[in-house]
Amino acid sequence: MEEFQGYFELDRSRQHDFLYPLLFREYIYALAHDHGLKKSILFENAGYDNKSSSIIVKRLITRMYQQNPLIFSANDSIQNPFFGQNKNFYSQIISEGFAVIVEIPFSLRLVSSLERKEIAKSHKLRAIHSIFPFLEDKFSHLDYVSDVLIPYHIHLEILVQTLRYWVNDASSLHLLRFFLHEYWNSLITQKNHITIFSKGNPRLFLFLYNSHICEYEYFFLFLRNQSSHLRSTSSGIFFERIYFYVKIEHFVKVFYDNDFQCILWFFKDPFMHYVRYQGKSILASKDTPLLMKKWKYYLVNLWQYHFYAWFQPGRIDINQLCKYSLYFLGYRSSVRLNPSVVRSQMLENSFLINNAMKKFETIVPIIPLIGSLSKANFCDTLGHPISKPTRADSSDSDIIDRFLRISRNLSHYHSGSSKKKSLYRVKYILRLSCVKTLARKHKKTVRTFLKRLGSEFLEEFLTEEEVVLSLIFPRTYSTSRRLYRGRIWYLDITSINDLVNYE
């Protein structure tokens, strides 16, 4: 038991000090502003209110500690227009500053971990698409899978207590606790009995939520390693925006003989495979359903008795992987059996051999994606393209560039799809919606405006992959078509856009 306790206390022993004055530094909000500009990859970013300054933050924190923080004088409202805003505005300013500050100790911890283990190019480990090669490699050999929704009902005090393990600064923790209690109603929304964070203030709460889930995953990964067929000799945990488990060594050195200089290696076969992103986790194994049920109740008890979160066992279903589809990160992933018949001839006798190969498939679900396009006014609910309202001062090139950027971002993200038919339909919707938007602006028919644009306009909606392949294989169309239909996983995608994030 002492060995287990030491495992759990290993990383907690490194507490970092918060510098409380960081809340009043201008560059903290400059970093938050820079993050806001890079966050959106689909639409024109509305920007972050760059008028926020350390003076405003000082006034807000002072008023938070007062008995009536929302009572402002008339002079303040005239001299400073920010105090005429609603309560959400104040919470956004402080939460952005908090988010930048609380990430500093974890960033230092990550850098020191990478330097200690001599791991380079860690940015590729942060890519969302890095999960799919793992699924592609492992899931075709597994039998059972559980799609688990992690409970969101987390008390405020639990979030603060979790952060105390990593931060040794009472002033910042007290301010964080006061801030959460004061602005809780404006920072979360209740939907279908599940607490979700408001889109206006996601960064701080996603960090607090991930730090809370990190505690749970320490326990889970420890139990997982203990139950592996061969224990892991080396492992690394990377705590970032996208947190996942990274195995450094894939083989276990079992035997070494100095005389013959021979090394015997066994491939490590973990008992349970675990993937988590956002509020969903996936557990997969090739063992019997009975063992999967045991792990199911382990998770329920761990959540309820250690993390004080109510978890219904009925929400965890155990399914056969070959008969189940996972809706994960904008893809519908499944493992399908591809039957093949081989004719074998042996002397005068011939017989047929039926083989079934497992293949991991990733398909773009068209119905939810059309729903997202419909909400963004690119098409109606049936998928028919419509014109999108634009500002009168928008130029034609700006409108075309905007539609091209959306189309290429979607093509870039869904490049790992096994079948491109759904993706072609989405590109068709965006292309025709762009034409209708331009025709509406110039008060002309779609046919007339399309003739004016010509075929070059349609070629602009080709992705970079299609253009490159057409240049490499100009005459062998079948070869380029086959290559483009293949899956391509990009390791530079670190955020999921709004149209894909329809779950």
UniProtKB/Swiss-Prot annotation:
User: Could you tell me the Gene Ontology terms of the biological process aspect for this record?
Assistant: mRNA processing; RNA splicing; tRNA processing
Looking up InterPro entries in the UniProt record yields: Domain_X (IPR024937), Maturase_MatK (IPR002866), Maturase_MatK_N (IPR024942)
Matching PANTHER family, A to Z?
Answer: MATURASE K
Keyword terms of this UniProt record: Chloroplast, mRNA processing, Plastid, RNA-binding, tRNA processing
Q: What's its job?
A: Usually encoded in the trnK tRNA gene intron. Probably assists in splicing its own and other chloroplast group II introns.
The molecular function terms of the Gene Ontology recorded here are:
RNA binding
Give GO cellular component annotations, separated by semicolons: chloroplast
Give the matching Pfam families: Intron_maturas2 (PF01348), MatK_N (PF01824)
Q: What family classification does the UniProt entry report for this protein?
A: Belongs to the intron maturase 2 family. MatK subfamily.
Q: Where is this gene product found?
A: Plastid, Chloroplast
Originating species: Eucalyptus globulus subsp. globulus
Instruction: Say if the entry is tagged with keyword RNA-binding.
Output: yes
Q: Where is the signal peptide?
A: none
Primary site of residence:
plastid
> What protein name applies here?
Maturase K
